[in-house]
Amino acid sequence: MTDIHNHKILILDFGSQYTQLIARRVRELGVFCEIFPHDVAADFIKNYQAKGIILSGGPESVYDSDVKAPEIVFELGVPVLGICYGMQTMVMQHGGEVKGADQSEFGKAIINILNSTNNIFSNMEHEQLVWMSHSDKVTQTGEHFEIIASSTNAPVAAVAHKNKPFFGVQFHPETTHTENGKQIIENFVVNICGCDTLWNIENIIENDIKEIKQKVGTDKVILGLSGGVDSSVVAAILHQAIGDQLTCIFVDTGLLRLNEGDQVMQVFAEHMDINVIRINAKNRFLDALRGICDPEQKRKIIGKLFVDIFDEEAAKIENAKWLAQGTIYSDVIESAGNNQSKAHVIKSHHNVGGLPKEMKLKLLEPLRELFKDEVRKLGLGLGLPYNMLYRHPFPGPGLGVRILGEIKKEYVETLQKADAIFTEELYKHNLYHDVSQAFGVFLPVKSVGVVGDQRRYEYVIALRAVVSIDFMTATWANLPYDFLSLVSNRIVNEVKQVSRVVYDVTGKPPGTIEWE
C-alpha cells in the first residue's frame, strides 16, 4: 500500500490566524501536511523529510523581534514558500531589509506579476486580485532575491531566490479573497515541490483501517458515541476495521434535539449493526441540574456527570484495552497551546487529554490527523448519511445552554418541539445549508398572547440563525420575513407552552453565537 504521508509539506507557524487555512488548502490539493511551531528543533525539521516548507504569516514585526525561521530551513535544499511575515523573515535572513510601512494594508489589492517563468505564478494572468494583511514591508530584497510581483502599496509583493527554490508573497494565497490563491499554492506544492497527490479519502480509509488493525489487534475498544460528526465517523471507521470488537456507549442526557437518541440508535445499532449500549440518564441530569442557573456551572455539572456515567458503563465491559475518541487535527492544534501554536489559546478542548486518570485504557484517535471538512468526507466514504455529517454544530452540553437559567423537564420538551419546527422548515425551504447554524433558545419569561378567543400567558422562544466561515465571527442570517412568520405561527400554534417568538439579530461580535 502507498504511504499517504510519503510526500508531505511542513508548515512552520509564526502565529497567523490563517495558518490552519494554509494546511487545509494544501490538503485539498491531495497532499499531506502538518503544522509545527516555528522554533521547533532543527533535528526535527531535518528528520521530517518534507518535500517543501511553508513559513506562515504572523503578528510580529521582523525588525523588532527575534522570531525568525530556523537556518536549517534554508540549508536542506527543499523549496520554501514564505507568506507575509514568512516572506519578510526569509528575505531579512538573506540580507534584505524590512521596515514599517507608511500605511498598513488590510484588504483586497491588485498585484502585477513581473515574472511568471517556472515559479509560483506559472500559467497565471499578469494582474491578480489578492488579500493583503500587513503593517511592514520589504524595502530591499538584497542580492539573493528578485521581485516577481508588485502592487501600489507593496512594491515588493512577491519574491523569488535567484538560485534556489525559495519564494515569498506579501499577501495571503490561502484565503478565498485571493482570487487564484489555490493556483499559487498548487504551483508551489505540486509543480515546484513535486508532491504526488496521495492524500484522498479512499487512501485515508485504507490507511486508517490498516493502522487500527495493527494497533488494536484482537483487543476490545470502547467509544463514547454522541451522535455528533466526529464520534459518528470514529464509530464507522472502527466498525469497518475491527467489527464487534467495538462497543459504543451512548449516554442519553435528555438534553438532545427532538428524537435524536432514537435516530442515533437507528443509524448505528440497527442500520450499521454496531454494538451500542444506550444509557437513559435523563432523570440523573435533571436532578443534578435542579436549581442551577449559572451557565458555567451547568456546563461543568453536565460534563462531569457525563464522564461519571460513561466511566460506570465502561467499567462493566470486560477486557477492554482501548478508549476511542473523536479528536480531530484542529483540536490538537488548538489545545496544544504554546507548545504547538504561537497564536493565543482560545479554549481547551474536551476531546484532547480527556482520559480519566483512573481508567487504565490506551487512547485511540483515528481522526487525529484530519480537519473537520476531511472528517465529513471520510464519513461519506464510509456510508454515513449526508444530513448527519452536515448538520449544524451542536454544543457539548446540548440544550442545557439553550435554556436560559434553570433546566426543567417542561422547558426541555418545549424547546425540543420549537427547535424541531424551525429545523424542519429550514430544510423544507432549502435554507438549512444556507446558514451555518440555526436553533431555538428557551427564555424562562412569560408573555401575554391570544390564541383564538383565549388569552394565553406562556413562554418565549428566540430563534437564532447565523452565517459564518470559521465561527470566530458571524453575522445574523437575513432569513425571509415570510419564512420567519411561518415558523413563528407554527411554533405558537403547535407548542402550547409558547405564546411569543422573537428573532435574534445580533452578530458576533458583539454577541456570541450561543446565548449561554
From Swiss-Prot:
Top-level taxon in the UniProt lineage: Bacteria
Record-annotated Glutamine amidotransferase type-1 domain positions: 8-198
Pfam families (UniProt xref): GATase, GMP_synt_C, NAD_synthase
Catalytic reaction annotation: XMP + L-glutamine + ATP + H2O = GMP + L-glutamate + AMP + diphosphate + 2 H(+)
The keyword Ligase appears for this protein: yes
Pathway recorded for this protein: Purine metabolism; GMP biosynthesis; GMP from XMP (L-Gln route): step 1/1
Keywords from the named record: ATP-binding, Glutamine amidotransferase, GMP biosynthesis, Ligase, Nucleotide-binding, Purine biosynthesis
Enzyme Commission code: 6.3.5.2
One cellular component (GO) term of this entry: cytosol
Catalytic residue positions: C84 (nucleophile), H172, E174
TM spans (from-to): none
UniProt binding sites for ATP: S226, G227, G228, V229, D230, S231, S232
Protein task: Catalyzes the synthesis of GMP from XMP.
Protein name: GMP synthase [glutamine-hydrolyzing]
Species in which this protein is naturally found: Francisella tularensis subsp. tularensis (strain WY96-3418)
Phylogenetic classification of the source organism: Bacteria, Pseudomonadati, Pseudomonadota, Gammaproteobacteria, Thiotrichales
Gene expressing this chain: guaA
